[in-house]
């Protein structure tokens, strides 16, 4: 515990005792004055801040060799860092190699290898310019250029040597970086190839504060590992990357999210995933109970969100997939941990014309409705005292109507999810505005409730118990 945290704890402790009348005011007057003065002095630096790891810990993470570089190919992950980029900057802790895939005269891929391209060793990892400074990456005339050298290639892979770390636009990542030229030749995607366990160290610290309970961090790690491998298995074969770095999948911040606590959670759960009977959905619409008692164990998408608001949701109602561990459970825990403005979020008003425009852009078919005049619940989950919208009906000035999943509506109108925090809310038209009121919870609400996991860990529950609660009828197995 830092001195700042200790000061705040003592201040709260003294205040509560005085309120209860259990302390003699005179005897503790000077102590309280001291604590108050110190707290006031520190207040400007505390407002809006969260605890951060010491700089030394960050420095050590950047210079420590990347674990898992010898992992089997199925346990490497491809993370989309940039999409349709036209330029970026790279920097390195070490020399790097470049491998290119180019079409030959027969249009067959051919590798070309360039060693130590203009990259002397960088002895330090300070915040100043390292060695010769950042390396520019651009695209022009259908070619990707690195440090001014163009490559007639569809794919350019940059492989830093130990500690296998690179910096992309100021953020540090482990592994290698593949630059993939768009078919039109005017942009590129940047994809981070990284061992699974190193990837998780960049996810868990971004998805959950590293000062939370170790058992909550371990539960988060197992859920994130399971989710990653499921998405990779289901979608990775059809594209050049497995997951994006955003909340569309899992938030990934690379080395900036690492800390000793996070690596402890990753290392102590290495290879552990959640499985359930016949996790893959089977023929479309097949309910889990129809798959048979002899179905094999398999991974499933172990979704999770910040604050469920009191009950987790059935994945079928949000994402359209049906898995027995994702049917939804009551959650009496998260209100004890969640910030008040997350558990009960404030009324939000959106301009009606903007709502229509955003819906038209995202779903062109909705233009046939004209201006959106009515948004009504078509399906909702009732949890006694509150309900979560799962499907909504849109009606327009043309007299036509259409339907959307409520979660799709939420993220279309507020892609960051910071204003419309969940679909536990009421929607009404007021003049030229849409009003979202009585909001509750933060996120899609499927799978593990992160605040609930922290509350359970505070009560002494271990990671296995937390996961068994939020993903019933699943169990943990170790892949390696």
Across the structure, where does each feature detected by a protein language model lie?
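Conserved, single-site charged/polar hotspot
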Residues: 38-42, 46-480
């Amino acid at each position: 515990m830092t001195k700042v945290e200790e000061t705040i704890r003592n201040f709260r402790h003294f205040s509560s005792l005085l309120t209860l009348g259990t302390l003699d005011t005179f005897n503790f007057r000077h102590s309280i004055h001291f604590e108050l003065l110190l707290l006031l002095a520190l207040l400007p630096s505390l407002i809006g801040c969260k605890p951060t790891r010491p700089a030394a810990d960050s420095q050590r993470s950047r210079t420590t060799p990347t674990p898992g570089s010898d992992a089997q190919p199925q346990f490497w992950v491809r993370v989309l860092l940039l999409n349709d980029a036209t330029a970026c900057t790279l920097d390195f802790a070490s020399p790097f190699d470049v491998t290119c895939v180019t079409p030959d005269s027969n249009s067959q891929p051919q590798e070309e290898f360039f060693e130590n391209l203009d990259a002397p060793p960088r002895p330090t990892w300070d915040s100043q310019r390292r060695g010769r400074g950042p390396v520019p990456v651009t695209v022009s005339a259908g070619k990707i250029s690195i440090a001014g050298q163009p490559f007639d290639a569809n794919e350019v892979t940059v492989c830093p040597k130990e500690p296998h770390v690179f910096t992309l636009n100021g953020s540090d990542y482990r592994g290698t970086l593949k630059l993939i030229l768009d078919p039109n030749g005017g942009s590129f995607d940047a994809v981070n190839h990284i061992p699974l366990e190193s990837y998780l160290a960049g996810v868990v610290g971004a998805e959950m504060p590293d000062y939370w309970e170790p058992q909550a961090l371990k539960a988060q790690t197992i859920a994130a590992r399971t989710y990653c491998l499921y998405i990779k298995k289901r979608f990775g074969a059809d594209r050049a990357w497995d997951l994006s770095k955003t909340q569309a999948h899992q938030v990934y911040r690379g080395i900036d999210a690492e800390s000793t606590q996070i690596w402890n959670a990753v290392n102590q759960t290495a290879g552990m995933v959640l499985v359930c009977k016949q996790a893959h959905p089977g023929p479309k619409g097949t309910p889990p109970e129809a798959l048979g008692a002899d179905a094999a164990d398999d991974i499933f998408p172990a979704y999770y969100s910040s604050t469920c608001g009191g009950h987790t949701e059935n994945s079928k109602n949000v994402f359209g997939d049906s898995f027995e561990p994702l049917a939804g459970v009551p959650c009496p825990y998260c209100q004890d941990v969640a910030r008040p403005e997350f558990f009960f979020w404030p009324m939000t008003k959106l301009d009606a014309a903007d709502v229509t425009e955003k819906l038209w852009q995202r779903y062109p078919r909705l233009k046939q409705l004209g201006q959106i005049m009515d948004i009504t619940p078509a399906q909702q989950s009732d949890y006694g005292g509150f309900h979560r919208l799962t499907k909504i009906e849109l009606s327009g000035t043309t007299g036509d109507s259409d339907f959307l999943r409520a979660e799709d509506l939420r993220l279309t109108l507020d892609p960051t999810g910071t204003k419309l925090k969940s679909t536990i809310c009421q929607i009404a038209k007021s003049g030229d505005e849409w009003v979202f009121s009585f909001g509750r919870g933060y996120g899609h609400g499927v799978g593990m409730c992160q605040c609930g996991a922290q509350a359970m860990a505070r009560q002494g529950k271990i990671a296995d118990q937390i996961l068994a609660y939020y993903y019933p009828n699943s169990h943990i197995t170790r892949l390696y």
